[in-house]
Amino acid sequence: MPRLLLIAIGALWVAGCQLAPEHRRPLLPTVEHYPGALEPQQGSVVASEITWPAFFRDPRLRMLIGTALEYNRDMRIAVLRVEEARGQYRVRDAERYPTVGLDAAAVRSRSNIPGGAGAAAAGGLSGGISERYSVEVGVTAFELDFWGRVRNLSEAARAEYLATVQAQRAFQLSLIGDVASTYMAIRSAEQRLQLALSTVENRRDEVRISKVRLDAGIASALEYNQAKALLAQAETQLSEIRLLLARQSNYLRLLVGTVPDARPPEPLPLNRQLLEPALAAGLPSQLLFSRPDIIAAEERLRAARANIGVARAAFFPRISLTGSAGYASAELDGLVSGENRIWSIGPSVSLPIFDFGGRRANLTVAEARENIAVAEYERTVQAAFREVADALAGRRYLAEQLARQEGNVRTLRNIAELADVRYDEGVVNFLQVLDAERSLFDAEQALLQIRRAQLENLVALYVSLGGGTRAGAEQ
């Protein structure tokens, strides 16, 4: 009989393991290679295996990123949420094991009971004082988890904890990218500001020259007004760049979370900001294991499926066990002795019979949440694929834009120099010189913006490929 009981309990335990759906990663249509990706270059490196201090070479940028990871308020919230989720998981996991308590009591009581003739003379009651001492170790309402309810609660809490850890890593990676992109935008704006300041000075000189020529009668009012208009345009653009620089600097201070060091390290030129070897795109399937946001979405799906097991277990009886063992005696001396030993044990069963569809509705909610988690996982994967594809396309076509714009700037610089020479020779008028200089200024500004976009795109590629997530170093 005991053997049959053990077999039955084992069968129930195995059945309990089947209440939660088996976790399987949703299948998504993927391609072998990202669209528009170039062939891997010799010496290319895997982004997920490069720590951010190795990828970003500028010492000032590294200082800013390190400060942001320490002081950024959103980062601090993400870290605290990890601690919260860890605590919740420990609470749930502790419910899988019995809670053992120690009870000790000493009771002294007086009782009045009906007595005999002598007692009647004293009022009909006889009294006595009694003492009772006890010490017991017991287990209170330990649930025998035949159906896996407590185990699935623990599994769901564990998955939520792991999802929170990955969400914190995803935010950390995003913060690194935001700080780097903002810093590079500031450095680019500083270069554009210097170019704009130089252009404004040149435009002011041209206005003075045009005024002298106008007063001397060798230039027209059209030439003078054209010079003034170009000066106004340059000054307007200078103000726009200053506004952009101020906003980007304010945003960087917000990201860093504190006042930056008053004496930061010397920065590197923009063309030496990043690691020189090209980043390898890798296979799309590898992204599932390197992007923390994808891993977090899968853990949330795992938690949703564990909660289905919890909801299904509610249809079965909950069996709890309460027991204790110890000693009890009317005298304190000799309390812990064999003749004073006591024990008790007893199971309890709880099963709601009528709940007006509450358990069925709870199961429906759990299944709906699983479907939501599947959709969110698929959406996260698709968004990640798109981010990588966009960054790869940007790497390819921004390089083409940069090469063409550099050639355009060289051509326009030659035109501006020739216009100056031919103006000195009297072949062209001053308006043609101004037009050549304006075209060169616009082209140089565009070149700086393309270089900035190229750097920001490389940062986006590093982030979208899960940069540093498998490096195993402190980030």
Task: Give the location of each predicted region.
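Amphipathic alpha-helical coiled-coil segments
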Residues: 78-92, 171, 175-198, 202-212, ...
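Small/polar-residue-enriched beta-strand and adjacent coil segments characteristic
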Residues: 19-26, 50-51, 57-66, 71, ...
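Residues at or immediately flanking beta-strands
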Residues: 99-101, 221, 251, 318-320, ...
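Terminal intrinsically disordered/low-complexity segments used for targeting and assembly
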Residues: 2-70, 118-120, 158, 242-289, ...
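Repeat-solenoid scaffold signature
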Residues: 215-244, 446
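Short coil/turn motifs that cap or connect alpha-helices
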Residues: 220, 259, 428-429
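Secretory-pathway/luminal and periplasmic proteins that interact with or process carbohydrate-rich
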Residues: 90-91, 111-114, 236-239, 261-262
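Charged, alpha-helical scaffolding/interaction elements associated with membrane systems
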Residues: 71-72, 216, 425
